[in-house]
Every structure is written in structure tokens, then in C-alpha cells.
């Protein structure tokens, strides 16, 4: 067996007289003669002070660095960007959210390649920073491990009528809708505002960040049990230290990201997301990560796996509980062990421990699902997975719906068509949207938006106005992980690419059938052909800057909205 070099890249900056200048630079940041034989580990962090999601990452990065030292490596920390969806929601800033995923992946690749670092610990806390980091790991194919910042504790509020309840960030969006509809006072709205974020950590439900953290653990890219503990929990410091040690161990064994990120690993990730009833954004992100790993994953794989995996997590936004409750009952390993025992998970997949999924779960020996937060597989919330891909005349390439929170098996109604989200929001707040309507928001796709904005503001307003079970919302944009109800997104092809959604007109009948997995525009093809005659897309919204570049490169949502 050939000897494994645990410094596969950094020798070019540490060895020989040609490395004199680079060694001199590295001496200035603390390295010395005793360090040249150590592998150099990039500690990539999306820490910032803009959002509570990332506040713990500076502390966790220090723990990871200590772990790297303990393992025999030398850590070198660097930062990347992160966008807060909670702050950027509902205005122009949301155009930049999904774009940040690509910026994060590109920036981590840039530093790792330029500085010839040997391996990396990747730390993130916000929705797009998690997949961005995992995309970078897959693209680089070095020894790598991911560590999540952890989720926030739920807030607590007492309203003016004496009602007391736990609240998350999603409650604030819905409260805005209720206030605008005259169903909540501004005083109670302020009370909710002051309660939703009591400290550090990512949004607490099974929204996008917690879905992706669970997925990272299921993929084998995070230490077992590391997804669920809250951000403020000191177990996270232990996971940080162990992650630093683990990446050095991976280097010693010659294990790289693509050894872990196999087709079976992605199937495990989909199964776990289905069981939890995770965010629709997981479809985009897993497709993108798989593409970076050169794994043949398609949008149809989600239905194939979802057919056999029950939905067992009673978690917000559609359920009762949050990630802290999952942690109290054993975390992600509980779900993985239940799926493994039922033959719904591949136990032979390699992980960052150097052991297989089955070996890790045997060591942890997690308890069975508690039956409340996490149901048993023979008593599920739904018999199939919490996400479904729809196809039909309105979405030939596909659309995504969170069936875990969808309140109708069949919905048929007349279209109310809007170009971009703002026009739809104005119509809703003016009372021009009625029960039974199908609100169609086009030109919000990856290219046409650009940036495929999340529609949490309008979905929460619909729910807050009491129309959540009576109005269907369709878009070529996407939804927040906190969205629930009659919402279907990721419609592809998008409007700017002459997808059928571009040719829907007010009054057209649209029908969705969840059991049949169909989404159809009930208009004769001859009429659609006539509408296409002389059609031209809306002009680009941005002609300079990152969004102009992005709109020229980005692919269909059905391919993960990737740019490469």
C-alpha cells in the first residue's frame, strides 16, 4: 500500500529553498520551524455580527483550531460571507440570498486553492452558508468536515389577551399579516418582535438551516450527533474540538470529501430530509452539492426515495416542535437508526469518523423515536416523505411542494397572475385576493429574478390574513424553510426561459393533484401557442454587479440553480 502524505498540497509553501518567501510570510502569522511538517488546515467560517445565526462561529472556530493542533496539524482561519434571510426577506435584499451560496463556495475554493491548504473545517450557521460550504468541500475533494453553529432557543411571549406561547422567527412574519388584516394589535406585534430571537443560533424549526445541518450529518460530512444541540450548548465546543482532530485523522487516512459524498450518501440525505419533513430548499442544495461531487443525482430521485420513507418529525413550521426538542430526544441519530433498521438507509456509507454510518450508529446506540416529537415509522404523520416533486403542463421540468404542510390533496382555481412578488403583495394587502384564487408569481426564478427569492413574506401574510387554506401560491421563485401551506415553488422552466408559467393569464384554471404529483395549466395548447407568438421576456433587472453575472450563468432550479 502506498504511503499517504498528510501534507498533499502545502509542501509547495513549506519545503525547499523555493518556499523561502512563503515560509517567511507564515512565520509572521505564528508558524515556525517545528510546524513545517504539519498539514495546514483551513478553518473556513461564515462568522459575522449581522445575524444571531453566526454569532457562535468565532468561538467554535477557536475550538476547531485547538482540535487541529491536538491532532498534529496547523490551523489557519479565514472568513467568508453570509446573508441573513431573516433580515433580507421581502425586499430587494432577497435577490442576493441564493447568490451568496455560490459566492461562499467560490470564496472557500479560492482561498484553499491559492494558499495550498491540505484540508478544511467548514463552519456555518445560516441557510445558504451551509450548502455553500458543502459545495466547496465537494468541489475541492480534500479532507474536510462540516460543523453547524446550532439553532436558537425558542422565544417566549405573553400577549395582551393573556395567551402565553413559544415563538420563532416565523411567528413574526405571520403576525405582520395578522396585524395588517386587523387581527392583531401593534402592541402584540411588538411583543412578538422582542421575543423571537432570544440569543445566538439559527432559526429553531425544521427550516432550511436545520434541514441542511441534518442533511450534512446524514451525508457523513459532520460528526454523528452534531446537528441538533443548540448553539449555546457547550457540547458544541466539544464537537468543534473533535472536528479539528477528525480532519487531521482524515488526512492521515487519505479520506477526501468525495470518498464520503457518494450516490448512496445523497440517498441517505434525502431519506433523512423526507423523514423530518424538511425545507423545500434541500432539493436545490442537494442537487448543487451532488453536481460539485460529480454524483448523478436528479430531481426525480426525491420522489423515488420519498415514496418509501414516512414523514415522522412533528416539527415547525407545520408541526409543534423545534430542533431543541429533537436534541432532547436523541438528535438526528434517532431518525437515522430508525431508517437503518427499516432498511431505508445505506449503512455502509463512509463518514468523517473514518467509520461507516452503521458503525457510528452502533457506537451511539440512540433511543427509539419518542413517539411525539419523532413518531415511529409504523405510526407516521404521513406515510410518505414530506417533500414531493410535481410535474405537468405548468412545470414540465418539475416543481417542489412541501406536502408535510400542504392542506389539500387537490386544488383547482382561477389564476391571479403577477410579475414579481411586490405586485402580488400589494394586491393581497389591498384585499384583492380571494379564497379559491391561485396566485401565480412569475419572473422570480434563478435567472429572471434574479436570485430566486424566497416568498416567506407573502406566504406568511396570506396565512396571517386567514387565507392559508384557501389560496394557492405558485412561483418560479422559492420559499423559505419556514413556509407551510398551499405553496408550490421552483417551477421550471422559469418565466424568463419561456416556461409555461410565462404564459398564464388571469382567469386560467390551474389544477394541482398531490397524489398524482401533477401541476397542470388547463389551457388548450393552441391557445398557449398563440400567446407565445411575439413573446419576449422582461428585460434584465440588473445589468451590473454580481446579480448581472449570476443571471448569465445560473441554470434551472431543476438542476439546483448552479452556476458552473
Curated annotation (Swiss-Prot):
Homodimer. Its EC number is 4.2.1.9. Pfam families: ILV_EDD_C (PF24877), ILVD_EDD_N (PF00920). Signal peptide: none annotated. This is Dihydroxy-acid dehydratase. The modification N6-carboxylysine is found at residue 128. Binds 1 [2Fe-2S] cluster per subunit. This cluster acts as a Lewis acid cofactor. It comes from the Bacteria.
